[in-house]
Structure formats: structure tokens, C-alpha cells
Amino acid sequence: MPSRLRKTRKLRGHVSHGHGRIGKHRKHPGGRGNAGGLHHHRINFDKYHPGYFGKVGMKHYHLKRNQSFCPTVNLDKLWTLVSEQTRVNAAKNKTGAAPIIDVVRSGYYKVLGKGKLPKQPVIVKAKFFSRRAEEKIKSVGGACVLVA
């Protein structure tokens, strides 16, 4: 049968209020902070902080990661890297200065040869060119410029 009063109400008038005579509800009965995470607080640590204890794997200190990082772009996507205005201007004056497309600024390193280029010269700057990409750019009167 449920009780009508809460425990705190029942303990009114009792000096120690259920906390004993000696310690008087003081100090740190379970240890301070994260003490006992492997022992008496084990359940809490396993449930809410899995993987808190222990080591995993080995550390390779002077490892050079991903040296083969080389994002690529194909010729058919090359004109999408420049603004619409540049495309319109290049189409209008065929004899003027060729537009420069810097693929490195757009986050690519290598130009690959898939697709066709429109018949207007263009200067492409990149770190690497595939053989077929270089042939196609030069066939429309463009130039391939290697950048560091």
C-alpha cells in the first residue's frame, strides 16, 4: 500500500535525517570525480561511457597520409568551372584572348580526356594532364599550362 507521506516529511524532527551519527552526510562516499569507474561505478561507465577505458590499436607517428591525393575533372565538365559570363564572352569573340580555366582553384589537380570541347581555344591550368586531354585541348587551339 502506498504511503501518504514522502520520506522527507517522515524524517522531520529526527536529528540525523537518515544520514547517521558519525559522517552526518558529509565528504565523498563514492570517491571524488570519476573514481571507481572500473570498480564500484562500473555499471554507470559501461552504460553511459563505453570505451572510456583501455587502448585501441597502435599509433604510427610520422606517417605520411594519402600522398596519392589527386582529384580529377573531365573535359566535358571543364566549362562548368568558369562563370556563365565568361562562357558567353568566349563564345562571342572567337578571335580575342582565350579564357583561362584554373582547375586547381576549383579543387581539382588532374584533367582527364572524357568528352568533347567546344571549338574555341582555352588555356587550362592544372598540376597534371592525361595524354588524351592534352591532345583534345590543343586540337581546339588551346594550351595546357602546368602549375606547381
Swiss-Prot record:
Residues 1-30 have a biased composition (Basic residues). Residues 1-38 are annotated as: Disordered. GO terms for biological process: cytoplasmic translation; translation. Component of the large ribosomal subunit. The keyword GTP-binding does not apply. Keywords: Acetylation, Cytoplasm, Hydroxylation, Phosphoprotein, Ribonucleoprotein, Ribosomal protein. Hydroxylated on His-39 by MINA. Belongs to the universal ribosomal protein uL15 family. Gene3D superfamilies: 3.100.10.10, 4.10.990.10. InterPro entries: Rbsml_uL15_N, Ribosomal_uL15, Ribosomal_uL15/eL18, Ribosomal_uL15/eL18_sf, Ribosomal_uL15_CS. Component of the large ribosomal subunit. The ribosome is a large ribonucleoprotein complex responsible for the synthesis of proteins in the cell. GO terms for cellular component: cytoplasm; cytosol; cytosolic large ribosomal subunit; cytosolic ribosome; endoplasmic reticulum; membrane; nucleoplasm; synapse. It is found in: Cytoplasm. The modification N6-acetyllysine is found at K47, K55, K110. The modification Phosphoserine is found at S68. This is Large ribosomal subunit protein uL15. The modification (3S)-3-hydroxyhistidine is found at H39. GO terms for molecular function: RNA binding; structural constituent of ribosome. It comes from Homo sapiens. The keyword Membrane does not apply.
